[in-house]
């Protein structure tokens, strides 16, 4: 495993982050054995959220039983809408942070993210609350998940004008598998920086040196190794409806075909190529990966050792016809 420090977080993050939105944890079941195995792979950073069912409770159970809170980095999120009701308000933010403390069994969260945005809300009000918790030592870095780079810039302008800590981290969708449709929809919805239409966003992250925590890094399973590039109809049977809505488009099957070809040439797997593509970007990015078995995480982590040439990165993403 490789590790990297980011601003306002005392401990280094593992370059691959384990996503805790998996059935066993969402249902609040005992995931200690799985988390032990993931941790043994060197993964020390775990992503969860207030609205991931009982995921925080399951993670907190493991932290308590193993006594390793000081050795791991916790990412959690709040202010997700419920029943079509936007919840990006100071009151909901405070409620969700406090509830996460209780569920996780901790008095601080290393990285806290606004899970969704509400364009009707001035971001400065969120910046004020997050700074209160940061000043009290209850959260480290903070930022947005599914916030556009323009909205983050707006929040950071407010922070600069008022002498406050700005957003220093962001968690949009990012991966070789372009999120062409919104998997969940509703409101401002999901934000992606993948694909040809989001080159400006990626340049902004590079220029502003804000690290990206990339969710759905394998396209909700489309680039996880089971889907084949020559079988779109079969993919629709393998993937969940949200993944089909977000990722099952001809462009992504062409990307998958190229990933299959390169994986064969480099004697590795499709998910390893897809993760290596993320890790070989020209900006700071940490892919989030989930799995029901730690062996898959161990396999995926080998992507850290794969070096891709710039021409290969561009070819995989359909930005050039030849390598």
Task: Annotate the PLM regions.
Residues 101-122:
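Active-site groove signature of glycoside hydrolases
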Residues 70-83, 170-174:
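A short, structured active-site edge motif that brings together acidic residues
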Residues 18, 48, 76, 111-114, ...:
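Conserved beta-strand positions
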Residues 1-73, 135:
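N-terminal binding-site loop/beta-alpha segment at the start of enzyme catalytic domains
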Residues 121-323:
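Beta/alpha (TIM)-barrel catalytic core signal, keyed to glycine-rich beta->alpha loops juxtaposed to Asp/Glu
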Residues 26-38, 88-104, 153-157:
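Short, acidic/polar
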Residues 19-29, 78-92, 120:
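Active-site mouth loops of central-metabolism enzymes
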Residues 11-16, 42-45, 68-72, 106-110, ...:
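Short, well-ordered coil/turn segments that N-cap beta-strands
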């Amino acid at each position: 495993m490789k590790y990297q420090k980011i601003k306002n977080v005392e401990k280094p993050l593992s370059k691959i982050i384990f996503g805790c939105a998996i059935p066993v944890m969402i249902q609040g079941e005992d995931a200690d054995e799985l988390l032990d195995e993931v941790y043994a792979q060197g993964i020390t950073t775990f992503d969860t959220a207030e609205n991931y069912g009982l995921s925080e409770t399951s993670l907190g159970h493991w932290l308590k039983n193993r006594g390793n809170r000081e050795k791991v980095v916790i990412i959690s999120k709040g202010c997700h809408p419920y029943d079509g009701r936007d919840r990006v308000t100071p009151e909901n933010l405070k409620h969700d942070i406090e509830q996460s403390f209780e569920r996780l069994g901790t008095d601080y969260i290393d990285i806290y993210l606004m899970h969704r945005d509400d364009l009707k809300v001035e971001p400065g009000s969120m910046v004020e609350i997050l700074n209160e918790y940061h000043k009290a030592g209850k959260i480290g870095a903070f930022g947005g998940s599914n916030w556009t780079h323009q909205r983050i810039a707006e929040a950071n302008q407010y922070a600069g004008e008022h002498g406050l800590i700005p957003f220093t981290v962001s968690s949009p969708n990012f991966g070789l598998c372009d999120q062409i449709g919104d998997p969940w929809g509703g409101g401002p919805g999901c934000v992606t920086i993948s694909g040809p239409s989001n080159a400006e966003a990626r340049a902004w992250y590079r220029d502003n040196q804000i690290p990206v925590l990339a969710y759905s890094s394998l396209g909700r399973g489309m680039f996880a190794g089971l889907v084949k590039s020559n079988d779109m109809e079969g993919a629709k049977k393998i993937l969940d409806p949200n993944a089909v809505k977000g990722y099952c488009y001809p462009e992504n099957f062409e990307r998958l075909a190229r990933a299959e070809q390169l994986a064969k040439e480099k004697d590795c797997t499709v998910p390893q190529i897809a993760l290596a593509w993320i890790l070989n970007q020209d900006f700071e990015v940490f892919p989030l990966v989930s799995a029901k078995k730690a062996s898959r995480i161990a396999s995926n982590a080998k992507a850290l050792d794969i070096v891709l040439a710039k021409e290969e990165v561009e070819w995989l993403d359909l930005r050039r016809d030849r390598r």
